[in-house]
Amino acid sequence: MEDDGGERSSFVAGLIENRAKEVGMAAFDLRSASLHLSQYIETSSSYQNTKTLLRFYDPSVIIVPPNKLAADGMVGVSELVDRCYSTVRKVVFARGCFDDTKGAVLIQNLAAEEPLALGLDTYYKQHYLSLAAAAATIKWIEAEKGVIVTNHSLTVTFNGSFDHMNIDATSVENLELIDPFHNALLGTSNKKRSLFQMFKTTKTAGGTRLLRANLLQPLKDIETINTRLDCLDELMSNEQLFFGLSQVLRKFPKETDRVLCHFCFKPKKVTEAVIGFENTRKSQNMISSIILLKTALDALPILAKVLKDAKCFLLANVYKSVCENDRYASIRKKIGEVIDDDVLHARVPFVARTQQCFALKAGIDGFLDIARRTFCDTSEAIHNLASKYREEFNLPNLKLPFNNRQGFFFRIPQKEVQGKLPNKFTQVVKHGKNIHCSSLELASLNVRNKSAAGECFIRTETCLEALMDAIREDISALTLLAEVLCLLDMIVNSFAHTISTKPVDRYSRPELTDSGPLAIDAGRHPILESIHNDFVSNSIFMSEATNMLVVMGPNMSGKSTYLQQVCLVVILAQIGCYVPARFATIRVVDRIFTRMGTMDNLESNSSTFMTEMRETAFIMQNVTNRSLIVMDELGRATSSSDGLAMAWSCCEYLLSLKAYTVFATHMDSLAELATIYPNVKVLHFYVDIRDNRLDFKFQLRDGTLHVPHYGLLLAEVAGLPSTVIDTARIITKRITDKENKRIELNCGKHHEIHRIYRVAQRLICLKYSRQTEDSIRQALQNLNESFTEERL
């Protein structure tokens, strides 16, 4: 298998849908040999669920059935790929290739787990579309890559919506999880403004991809989250363990998960006539993978020494399942029987080629020994030729670099060349301050050297077939090792490292509950606080008794930052990381929805208001009782009356659910929601006025906004005529006086209901508190007295 070598996802995705708008997806990761199956119902015509998954997997190839013969209502995903993913390679496969029966048989044969443990019988009817997509995807991979997927080698997972938090593609952009929002808008390069880039201190490609996957799909299982948090607790309190793990993880190859591909995929048999450069490269990659595996297995004893005294469940389980697993020692012994002990993984091209040529122990294959001698002789002849040219042409600084594409070539500093180079030098190219060139003698030796190396690779691969088959029997152990190393890399080199670079007590361990409040004390925006040292912290408290916050404030007062901050703290908590707050308790969120930003969407021919309404409609159609919704300035893109009516109506709809909603607005009238609905709380960002100018404090306070007509202040500063400003003030006073009288009347009517709700909120807090019975009893008595004396 060919390696992509980068951090970008190496997924191939198959997509198919039926008339009921059910979509089946199969996502095959070529690097880790894992297959992820998903089947779901699309609830919107814009295919938001499919977009979210495609954003998560970021496939390089998407396989779909043809459009021409498809019935109406069954071409949506194919059209979606054409419309939104034009840069991704689209492959159209005959509909007969999307065979769910064949897909089920393939999964049964290829999955590392037993069909019973995998739950294939249970999932067959529920995931028949994803099985059909799997059949087409595997067929394409085997045909395109020229390999056969070996039996019982794949890690297969059936993904349901209940497994992870769902964050739609729009929210991923609004929250700047992966890329800064203003990068695409303004073309800037400040990548550190995204959460992913901030935490991207992982050392392996697999760890980086796991971090990205966790940010896009945070966990929902409290036990798993707490297991990660327990591990972080031990790492933060035990410096020796933290630094020990940081050091030992560097000894493992960065591409450990790449090793799996060469054991999960078996090259198809080819004739001697077909053997050429492509097969030589595949042989070279296979040998490199065995050397990588040997390097990883050699580092396991050091990892065992570091983890031996670990207390937390996660690290103790790694020690037991990996470090004490005899299967790794068995694999290492088999490798040691044929691979030279002195061979190491190298990154320098010629050193790597030499290591691969001499990977096999001497004396195993006579033809290999002859090819090695030829390789050594030609390599020595090339270096002798360089020495000869240095003396003959008086070029003492002539260098002999090597790259895999052209082999050896000469590099000469331009300052050493007086006039024209001798005629012996060919292919002369200026490269910076140097001249790159070759000669006929060097070209001839390069051909012989490359041919000898290719013969070494092919002979070595032939000798290693038995070893490859033996290692494939323990493919599940290698899968476990790769997953463990990626997880440790993320927790140690990303989470723990990032927290350790912050001042003491800036990050704290969050508490996760199924039905408790969302409480964040002195929370901070994780990205902005790393850029601005004087970031102002703010708190939030939401519960069943107060499930909506209306946040008010002028432009630039901090509303949008606050909305982002709440969501990012929740996401960090649910990936099992400490959060930037003094204290945090989080009710596990199943979906995050955001409605932020105001721009026309030219691609979909939508105005700003139409974009707002489409995003709001998606939220209304998909919101659940455990969702977190943040909405910024809904309704400001149309007339004030229509905008207020729409914003009010949306708030009332969301209030009927148990979802937590944070609603930022300029509309003063929305503060009246709190006079009618006791589960609404109004907050505002405090702003001071000095010399008719706004002094932003970025401090969140209870109650409505107390800045008198900040719009008029800004208009006056902008230079509007004083007569216009004075007239506007008179009109505003009349409107405000009339509104205040009506609001006071409403407040009086609903005062008693608010008192009762405040009691209910205190009771809910006591329900989830960890105080002693005596403390709770005293708190209840104090609450009773406060209510009776109308002090509440």
Swiss-Prot record:
Specifically expressed in flowers. Disruption phenotype: Normal vegetative growth but severe reduction in fertility due to a decrease in chiasma frequency at metaphase I of meiosis. InterPro entries: DNA_mismatch_repair_Msh2, DNA_mismatch_repair_MutS_C, DNA_mismatch_repair_MutS_clamp, DNA_mismatch_repair_MutS_core, DNA_mismatch_repair_MutS_sf, MutS, MutS_con_dom_sf, P-loop_NTPase. ATP binds at residues 553-560. GO terms for molecular function: ATP binding; ATP-dependent DNA damage sensor activity; mismatched DNA binding. The keyword DNA-binding applies. Disulfide bonds: none annotated. It is found in: Nucleus. GO terms for cellular component: condensed nuclear chromosome; germ cell nucleus; plasmodesma. Coiled coil: none annotated. SMART domains: MUTSac, MUTSd. The keyword Nucleotide-binding applies. Keywords: ATP-binding, DNA-binding, Meiosis, Nucleotide-binding, Nucleus. GO terms for biological process: homologous chromosome pairing at meiosis; homologous chromosome segregation; meiotic mismatch repair involved in reciprocal meiotic recombination. PANTHER family: DNA MISMATCH REPAIR PROTEIN MUTS FAMILY MEMBER, MUTS PROTEIN HOMOLOG 4. Involved in meiotic recombination in association with MSH5. Required for reciprocal recombination and proper segregation of homologous chromosomes at meiosis. Promotes homologous recombination through facilitating chiasma formation during prophase I. Involved in the control of class I crossovers formation. Belongs to the DNA mismatch repair MutS family. This is DNA mismatch repair protein MSH4. It comes from Arabidopsis thaliana. The lineage of its organism: Eukaryota, Viridiplantae, Streptophyta, Embryophyta, Tracheophyta.
